Amino acid sequence: MISASRAAAARLVGTTASRSPAAARHQDGWNGLSHEAFRFVSRRDYASEAIKGAVVGIDLGTTNSCVAVMEGKQAKVLENAEGARTTPSVVAFTPDGERLVGMPAKRQAVTNPNNTFYATKRLIGRRYDDPEVQKDTKNVPFKIVRASNGDAWVEAHGKLYSPSQIGAFVLMKMKETAENYLGHTAKNAVITVPAYFNDSQRQATKDAGQISGLNVLRVINEPTAAALAYGLDKSEDKVIAVYDLGGGTFDISILEIQKGVFEVKSTNGDTFLGGEDFDQALLRHIVKEFKRETGVDLTKDNMALQRVREAAEKAKCELSSSVQTDINLPYLTMDASGPKHLNMKLTRAQFEGIVTDLIKRTIAPCQKAMQDAEVSKSDIGEVILVGGMTRMPKVQQTVQDLFGRAPSKAVNPDEAVAIGAAIQGGVLAGDVTDVLLLDVTPLSLGIETLGGVFTKLINRNTTIPTKKSQVFSTAADGQTQVEIKVCQGEREMAGDNKLLGQFTLIGIPPAPRGVPQIEVTFDIDANGIVHVSAKDKGTGREQQIVIQSSGGLSKDDIENMVKNAEKYAEEDRRKKERVEAVNMAEGIIHDTETKMEEFKDQLPADECNKLKEEISKMRELLARKDSETGENIRQAASSLQQASLKLFEMAYKKMASEREGSGSSSTGEQKEDQKEEKQ
C-alpha cells in the first residue's frame, strides 16, 4: 500500500503535474494562442504522413454496424453485399461449423437461438461477475460463461469465444464491405465506442479490430463522431448536445464547435441502457400476457422466445410511426390441448408505459453532463439525436422537455457515427485539414492509497491526450515494494470503482515510512487508453504498463484469435470459390442437356453417350461437393464444357451443311421451273 499523505507535502515543495498542450488549454484557457495557431500546433498529434491508403470509419454498434469512407471532402456510407447500409451485429455458428455474420445470421436466429450471438458489445471488456452480465445471462438464449481470466465470454457448440472475437467477426464483414467498394485491401480504420466506455472496454474494442486484421488508428467516442458528421460543413460557432440512445448504450456529450475545433466539454452515460432493454421490457410484457391468457409459460422455450423477441423489436419500430400495431405469431407453441397462437394489439401509449422507466434513466446523465460542462440548457444551440431509439416519439419529447428545444434531425441517427469516424480517418490521413477534435476521458482515473481510498490523478472530462504525475510514499517502515492499483470511476473508495489493473514497483531501499518518493504518472492517449508508470525517485527504478484489466486478452490470446480469424477468412474464401464453381458446373450441365435435346438428330449416338457419361461423372462430383475444392469442381466443369462445345460445333456444322444442301436443291428446282415457263 502507498500513502497519499506525502502528496500534499510534495506539492508544497514544488511537485507539479505535467500536462499535454490540449489538457492545459482545457483547464487554463487558450493561453493567448489563436484557434489557427493552436490547431497548427496540435495537429502533429492527429495526422500522420505514414498512413497509406483509405481509412475506413466503422461504427461497431450493439444492434447494427455501419461503415463509411471519405470521398474527397465528403463521407460516403457503404452498402453491404445484401444492399443495406447497416449490418446487424449478429454472429451465428451452424451445426456444421459454418459462421454466419449480419443478416444471414439474424434470419436463422429462430431455428438456432442457442448459437446465435447478438448484443455481445454489452459484454465486451466486462467480468463475468459484473451485475450487468449476470442480468444478461437471464435474458439471452445463448450461453454466457466465465472465461479462465474471469471475463464474460460466450459459448457455441462447445467452443468459447470472447466478445472481442465476436466483434472482430462483425468488423471483418464491415472490412469486406469496404474492400468490395474500394477495390483493394482496407487496412486502416477508425472505430467508435460509447463515450462512457471504460479503459477495459476500449482496449477490448481495439483488440477486436486487431483480431479482424485492421490497423486501428484511433478509437473515438460515438457522440463525438456524430458531432463531426453534424458540424463538418457548419460555419457558425455553437454549443451542441449529442443525445445518443442506441441498441445497447446511452451517451450524452456536450461539445463546443468553434472554427473547425470540436471540443468536448463533458460526457456522461450508461453503458447498459439501450434498445435491447426496450425489446426485453416488451418481451416480458408479451410473455406475461400470453401466460395470463393461455396458461403457457414461454420462458422455457428458446425458439418461441426468439420469435417473440423478433416480434417485439418489429413492434417497437412500428410504433415510432404508428399509434397501434398488431403482434401475430401463429403456432407459437403447443400444449395438451393443441397449438397456441399469439394475437395481440399494442398501442403506442401502452408501449410508452412499459418503457417509461428506461427513458427516465437518460435524464440524470444529461443533467450531470450540463453541470460538468458548466452550461445551462439555454446555452445549448442544438441537440443532435443519434441511435435508432431516438426515433421513438416519447424519447424525442423527453429530450425536448430536458433541453427546452426541439431536437435537430440534421443527421441520420443510424449513419452519423460511421460518417464521423470516416471524417476522423480523413483527419488522421491528412485528407481533411480544417478539423480538430479534442475529446475527453469519461471517468476519473487514480490509484488506491492507504485505507482503500481512491486518490484521483486525472479527473473526468479532462481533454485527451493528457499526462499527469503525482508523488506518493510508503505506508510502512522498511517497505521495499509498493503495489499500484489503478482504478477508474467516481466513488470515494477504490473498491467501489472499476479496477483496471495493478502492478508492483520493487527494489525500494528500506527507509522509514513517508521517506521514499514514488512518482506515479498517468498518460492517456488519444484513444482514451491508459498508460501508467511508477518511479522511485531515489533509485531511478521504474515500472511501466499499458493498463490491461486483470482479465482482458493477452498478446498470445490476440495472436491466436488473429490466426483463427484468418483461418475463418480462408475458409470463407474457399467456401465462396466452391459455391461459385458448383453454380458454374450446374449451369454447364443444364446447358449441355438442353443442347443435346436440341441437336439430338445431328449428334452421333456414340458421342452422345460419351457426353452423358461425362455429365454423370460431373453429377457424382457435385454429390460430394463439400469434400471437394472449388478448383477441382471448376476444372471438371471446364472439361465437360470443352467436350460439349466440340460436339455441338460438329452438330452445328452438320446442320448448316444440310441446310445448304436443301437450299441448293430447292434453287435447282426453281431454275428448272423457270425454264419450263419460258418454253
UniProtKB/Swiss-Prot annotation:
Activity-regulation annotation: The chaperone activity is regulated by ATP-induced allosteric coupling of the nucleotide-binding (NBD) and substrate-binding (SBD) domains. ATP binding in the nucleotide-binding pocket (NBP) leads to a conformational change in the NBD, which is transferred through the interdomain linker (IDL) to the substrate-binding domain (SBD). This elicits a reduced substrate affinity and a faster substrate exchange rate. Upon hydrolysis of ATP to ADP, the protein undergoes a conformational change that increases its affinity for substrate proteins.
Modification sites for N6-succinyllysine: K135, K138, K206, K300, K360, K368, K394, K567, K600, K610, K646
Record's subcellular location: Mitochondrion; Nucleus, Nucleolus; Cytoplasm; Mitochondrion matrix
GO biological process, one term: regulation of erythrocyte differentiation
Transit peptide, UniProt annotation: 1-46
EC numbers: 3.6.4.10
Annotated segments matching region Nucleotide-binding domain (NBD): 63-431
Omega-N-methylarginine modification, residue list: R513
Amino acid composition bias (Basic and acidic residues), ranges on this chain: 669-679
Region (Interdomain linker): 432-441
Residue positions where N6-acetyllysine is found in the record: K76, K135, K138, K143, K206, K234, K288, K300, K360, K567, K600, K612, K646
Top-level class of the enzyme under EC nomenclature: hydrolase
Binding sites annotated in the UniProt record for ADP: T63, N64, E313, K316, S320, G388, R391
Region Disordered: start-end pairs: 655-679
Positions bearing Phosphothreonine: T87
GO molecular function: ATP binding; ATP hydrolysis activity; ATP-dependent protein folding chaperone; enzyme binding; fibroblast growth factor binding; heat shock protein binding; protein folding chaperone; protein-folding chaperone binding
Keyword hit for Phosphoprotein: yes
Segments of this protein annotated with the region Substrate-binding domain (SBD): 442-679
Region (Interaction with NFS1): 1-432
HAMAP family according to UniProt: DnaK
Assembly and binders: Interacts strongly with the intermediate form of FXN and weakly with its mature form. Interacts with HSCB. Associates with the mitochondrial contact site and cristae organizing system (MICOS) complex, composed of at least MICOS10/MIC10, CHCHD3/MIC19, CHCHD6/MIC25, APOOL/MIC27, IMMT/MIC60, APOO/MIC23/MIC26 and QIL1/MIC13. This complex was also known under the names MINOS or MitOS complex. The MICOS complex associates with mitochondrial outer membrane proteins SAMM50, MTX1, MTX2 and DNAJC11, mitochondrial inner membrane protein TMEM11 and with HSPA9.
Protein purpose: Mitochondrial chaperone that plays a key role in mitochondrial protein import, folding, and assembly. Plays an essential role in the protein quality control system, the correct folding of proteins, the re-folding of misfolded proteins, and the targeting of proteins for subsequent degradation. These processes are achieved through cycles of ATP binding, ATP hydrolysis, and ADP release, mediated by co-chaperones. In mitochondria, it associates with the TIM (translocase of the inner membrane) protein complex to assist in the import and folding of mitochondrial proteins.
Database matches in PANTHER family: HEAT SHOCK PROTEIN 70KDA (PTHR19375)
Protein name listed in UniProt: Stress-70 protein, mitochondrial
Species in which this protein is naturally found: Rattus norvegicus (Rat)
Top-level taxonomy: Eukaryota, Metazoa, Chordata, Craniata, Vertebrata
Originating gene: Hspa9
